[in-house]
């Protein structure tokens, strides 16, 4: 089970510049009938200020930072994360391209190889991580759309690349 509380604030300083501040609290309880290693209780907190600037009708940029804290209430795992992310988006007629890059520093104590540790770290590793992505969406005609995405991450020792392509037809 999960309970969540959110407080989000936003303000347009001009027609081109917006600031948002997203805050959340989550209480997560997971219970498995087969594996006791999948039983856990987590309290998570996140605060994330974000600035968005629209350069033109087609181009906008975002810069955000996030502070996350995740605590296992029935165990020893504890995570404090600082995330700095920048993104750029371009849209024109039937084409949209979005790219982002994040520096993520995970200060983690506990077993990061456990199910709970992996869930708390969102698949990343303790310490410094870099994550990036590029997404392209192209409408071929009124009922066919092409989506291509590329994601990468580096946690120090090895870089991982993931790509996908999808053709979607709506009838």
Residue ranges and their predicted role:
Residues 1-171:
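Exposed, low-structure sequence patches enriched in small/polar residues
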């Amino acid at each position: 089970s999960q309970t969540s509380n959110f407080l989000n604030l936003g303000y347009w300083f001009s027609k081109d510049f917006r600031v948002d501040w997203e805050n959340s609290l989550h209480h997560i309880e997971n219970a498995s009938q087969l594996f006791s290693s999948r039983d856990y209780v987590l309290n998570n907190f996140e605060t994330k200020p974000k600035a968005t600037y629209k350069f033109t009708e087609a181009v906008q940029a975002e810069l955000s930072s996030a502070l996350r804290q995740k605590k296992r209430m029935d165990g020893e795992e504890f995570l404090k994360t600082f995330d700095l992310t920048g993104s750029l988006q371009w849209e024109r007629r039937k084409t949209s391209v979005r790219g982002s890059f994040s520096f993520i520093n995970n200060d983690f104590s506990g077993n990061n190889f456990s199910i709970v540790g992996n869930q708390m770290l969102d698949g990343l590793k303790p310490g410094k991580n870099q994550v990036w992505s590029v997404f392209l969406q192209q409408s071929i005609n009124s009922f066919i759309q092409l989506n291509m995405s590329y994601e990468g991450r580096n946690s120090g020792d090895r870089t991982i690349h993931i790509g996908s392509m999808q053709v979607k037809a709506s009838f």
